[in-house]
Structure formats: structure tokens, C-alpha cells
A protein has these predicted regions:
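N-terminal assembly/attachment segments of tailed bacteriophage virion structural proteins
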Residues: 1-93, 100, 104-108, 121, ...
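Polybasic "coupling" helices that flank or enter modular domains
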Residues: 107-116
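Cysteine-rich, disulfide-stabilized extracellular repeat modules
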Residues: 114, 121-124, 139
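Right-handed beta-helix
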Residues: 120-132
Length: 144
């Protein structure tokens, strides 16, 4: 089960989608419909996302958390009071980045533990170039 994203398939009618993961800031949540960045609004305490129009039937809808990796959300100052909320934010940022890394790795092509061959996990592989060497993978287009 993913901890940092949720995926839906558009039905041409639904505009509201549940956000089933936690996040620190709303800016850390993004939505794509068929891979195109899409704007949305959050309601119900940030657990429901609403799109302005319903994704088409069969469209791939993804809401994904991307916690800031380039900027620390907590800055500790020497001599300042150490607050629980600062510790929680700092810990949560690191925890969320770990979850996101694990989720991203779960979507990657992996080596099978049974035969040490690449395993696409029953997903299509797209955007493959035509082969140029004898042992390259051949695309359907190349073979037709």
C-alpha cells in the first residue's frame, strides 16, 4: 500500500477524490490527470480534493505528496527553546521523505528474486526507442 500517493481512474463524472495520506503543507500535494499537472482545491480538513471538471472515462488520476527535500521546514537556533511542534515537523519531514522514496522505488522496474530478471510488475513499458543492437528490446512499432 502506498503511503504518499493515491491513484484513481476517471469515470467522466467524479470531481471529488479522497486524499488518504498525510502531508505537512498543501503545497506538498500535487495532482496529475493523464500525466498533466492539474489544479484542485482541498476541503474536509484537507482529506477531499475537488477538480474543476471530471476526468474523462479511463483517465489516470494521481494525487501525490512530494515533501520538500531542498529546504528544511524547521530551523533550530542555538539557545532557543526546543518546542515539541518543531521536533514533530522535523521528524515528520524526514519520515515523509522516506515514505516517498519507498513508494517511488515500488513503482520502478525491479529485479525478480526468483530468476534475477527485470520484472515490469505487469505494467506496460512506454517511451521505448527502436532497437539499434542485436540484444536491444524491440518495440511493437519496430516489429510491425
Amino acid at each position: 500500500m502506498a503511503n504518499s500517493f493515491v491513484r484513481y481512474t476517471g469515470d467522466g463524472n467524479t470531481t471529488q477524490f479522497s486524499i488518504t495520506f498525510d502531508y505537512i503543507e498543501t503545497a506538498h500535494v500535487a495532482c496529475t490527470v493523464d500525466g498533466v499537472s492539474t489544479t484542485f482545491t482541498l476541503s474536509s480538513g484537507g482529506t477531499v480534493a475537488t477538480l474543476s471538471s471530471a476526468p474523462a472515462l479511463g483517465a489516470s488520476v494521481e494525487f501525490r505528496r512530494t515533501t520538500s527535500q531542498s529546504a528544511r521546514l524547521t530551523d533550530y537556533q542555538a539557545g532557543s527553546v526546543l518546542k515539541e511542534s518543531d521536533l514533530d515537523t522535523d521528524s515528520q519531514q524526514a519520515f515523509f521523505m522516506g515514505q516517498e522514496a519507498i513508494d517511488n522505488a515500488g513503482d520502478a522496474i525491479q529485479i525478480s528474486s526468483t530468476n534475477f530478471q527485470w520484472d515490469a510488475l505487469n505494467k506496460r513499458i512506454t517511451n521505448v526507442a527502436d532497437p539499434t543492437s542485436a540484444q536491444d528490446v524491440a518495440t511493437k512499432n519496430y516489429l510491425e
